[in-house]
Amino acid sequence: MLITKKDVEYTARKRIEKLYDFAIRTGDRRYIIEMEHIAQRMDITLPANIKRGYCKKCKTPYRNQVVRIKKNLVTVKCPVCDDIRRFQISR
């Protein structure tokens, strides 16, 4: 049985989702770092909900963050490194 590229990508995506779940549950950075490493190695774009679920600067998953909403902009502040990220939303 041959392993196709789709099979490998499917397995990588499932592993990324599982690592993200572990990161959210435990609050551990190493799962986020491993998840990014897999996505980069397999040339996979992370889904938007995963991309927005952790701090890009310190790689800590958002758990108890400060969220502000103004018009069509959501501002999230990381509780660890105080980095601020802004996301556009449509209403």
Swiss-Prot record:
Gene Ontology annotations for the cellular component aspect, listed alphabetically: cytoplasm; ribonuclease P complex
Disulfide bonds: none
Catalytic activity, reaction form: Endonucleolytic cleavage of RNA, removing 5'-extranucleotides from tRNA precursor
HAMAP family: RNase_P_4
UniProt-listed GO biological process terms: tRNA 5'-leader removal
EC number: 3.1.26.5
Free-text cofactor note: Binds 1 zinc ion per subunit.
Positions with a binding annotation for Zn(2+): 55, 58, 78, 81
Location relative to the cell: Cytoplasm
Assembly: Consists of a catalytic RNA component and at least 4-5 protein subunits.
Membrane-spanning residues: none
Main location: cytoplasm
Function: Part of ribonuclease P, a protein complex that generates mature tRNA molecules by cleaving their 5'-ends.
A molecular function (GO) term: ribonuclease P activity
Name under which the protein is recorded: Ribonuclease P protein component 4
Cofactor(s) essential for the protein: Zn(2+)
Family of this protein: Belongs to the eukaryotic/archaeal RNase P protein component 4 family.
Keywords: Cytoplasm, Endonuclease, Hydrolase, Metal-binding, Nuclease, tRNA processing, Zinc
